């Protein structure tokens, strides 16, 4: 397995662990699962950063911000996340 493959494999595993942590929050509540969710999100963020650090993927800061902006625009249109009463 190459380094890039290993990074992507661990990234995939971390995504699954975030899914599991979110599921536990939904089932049992945030107060009992907050620290586990934070840990898994940080682990995922670490792997995302390694994807860029080792140039498994690359893009400019401007491209990152534009993609994030576009996602937020979609969420504003198709979800209720940004509504004041959510």
Model-derived features: where do they sit?
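Flexible "arm" and connector segments at domain edges
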Residues: 1-41, 45-86
């Amino acid at each position: 397995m190459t380094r890039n493959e290993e990074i992507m494999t661990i990234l995939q595993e971390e995504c699954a662990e975030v899914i599991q942590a979110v599921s536990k929050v939904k089932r049992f509540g945030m107060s009992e699962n907050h620290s586990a969710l934070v840990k898994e999100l940080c682990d995922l963020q670490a792997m995302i950063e390694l994807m860029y650090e080792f140039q498994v993927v690359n893009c400019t800061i401007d491209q990152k911000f534009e993609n994030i902006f576009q996602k937020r625009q979609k969420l504003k249109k198709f979800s209720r996340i940004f509504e004041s009463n959510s």
